[in-house]
């Protein structure tokens, strides 16, 4: 069962299963957040915004409202 990326704890590695909001799909795809890609949640800010991730060897920061639309499975 897939979980929202926004609900994953720091230090966990997951695999993207889908992006559920069309408006941000292209932006996330350009950053490497595509189905099948591994993501490591590096750090989460105290109020959960932003979330620092590593995807395709790059460090990225996502807003909470972006991370909630990325569905993932734990490895």
Model-inferred region functions:
Residues 1-75:
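Compact, glycine-rich, soluble single-domain proteins
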């Amino acid at each position: 069962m897939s979980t929202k990326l926004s609900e994953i704890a720091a230090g966990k590695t997951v695999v993207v299963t889908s992006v559920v909001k069309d408006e941000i799909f292209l932006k996330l795809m350009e950053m490497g957040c595509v189905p099948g890609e591994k993501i490591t949640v590096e750090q989460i800010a105290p109020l959960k915004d932003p979330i620092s991730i590593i995807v395709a060897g790059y460090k990225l920061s996502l807003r909470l409202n972006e991370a909630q639309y990325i569905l993932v499975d734990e490895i």
